[in-house]
Amino acid sequence: MRTLLSRSTELARRQFFHSSAFKSLSRRSRAMKHAPQPWFPIAASSVVDGTSARDCLVSFGADPESVEAMLERHPEVREYDAATEIAPRMSYLQFLEGRGELGDETAAECALRQPGILERKYETVFECPSRGYIAVNKPFAVRLDTPRGWLETDGDGNRVEKTRFTPRWEGDASCEDWLNATFPDKHHRFCHQLDTATSGIVLTASTKKAAGEAAKLFRERKAKKTYLAVVFGWPEEDEWTVNAKLGKDHDDPKGFRERVDEENGKPSETSFKVVQRGYCTLDGANRGVKVTRMRCKPITGRRHQIRLHLKHSGHPILGDMAYSDDGDSYRMFLHALELVMPFADEELRFATPPPASFEHVLSAEAP
């Protein structure tokens, strides 16, 4: 079995994102049979190359002294890229502030209180042209793909592109957009789903053959996933399995949520194992509450399966706004840690280290 650990492509990524070619590019169309898809810049073009984390935050209205104090407490933020991480995240927070979704806080105050929200780093975990696969470490709060447009004929008989998506803030881009920018010569097919709120391993195929081989493994439940989660409370057991059936929550007006439905739901199974019990260190409403870091292994692959099975166990995920009462944590603490693909000729294991945020969010003693 080959183990493929995360390797950073940070230098090449920054060189590309800060190039004049990248900043002048507004969209990219494929010369393929399907309609061209819209493509949006991932970096914030308003941020000058080389801008520090401090100066970027100040430019978004953060108090300079408060920024310095935050950086003393969270020195890792100094390493975040201003153009591709901090500025897009701040634009996103300003978007939420404009919609009244940050309560009494401003975007700058929210970022300074829980600066982990500013992290948005992509990494290429594995690239194998001969097999036709690319594995990526996706940031949290980034959707998997961008809704594609279509071609229509205008009054002059010309084929013109109609888009289904308009970016809502500077840097409002998907994992697909990043893949298209980083690997512009490939067509990317996602081999599985990963929730927008979840970070971690995403496997893509660049050929139909590769996509078919991966789909077969997922269909036959031979592909194995491992997730890392931080949940509310201290489970009594160190290990347990949940078999609750899952189905659509027809009472949800937005049609987003699923629910436990033992009568009409689909069979679902997830195993859980406690890694560490401790206390939440996030500034805010959850500071000091009991939380647990744990590994989760879904046997089946239902939508929101891990999230629902943890809620069903009495331990919803920290930051899961759909299945917990937590509207204060800056992210949902669920990360796709590992993916094992047992192909006919060899078994490949794609893995990433646990995110730093998963270490910082929990302490052995109450803060």
Q: Which residue stretches match the model-derived regions?
A:
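N-terminal chloroplast transit peptides
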Residues: 1-21
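RNA pseudouridine synthases
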Residues: 16, 27-46, 55, 69, ...
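Non-catalytic tandem-repeat scaffold regions and their flanking low-complexity/translocation tails
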Residues: 50-51, 56-66, 70-76, 82-83, ...
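Helix N-cap/coil-helix junction residues
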Residues: 62, 98-102, 185, 223, ...
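Short loop/beta submotifs within extracellular cysteine-rich repeat domains
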Residues: 77-80, 100, 117-118
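Long, compositionally biased
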Residues: 85-103
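Pseudouridine synthase
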Residues: 172-175, 179, 208, 286-343
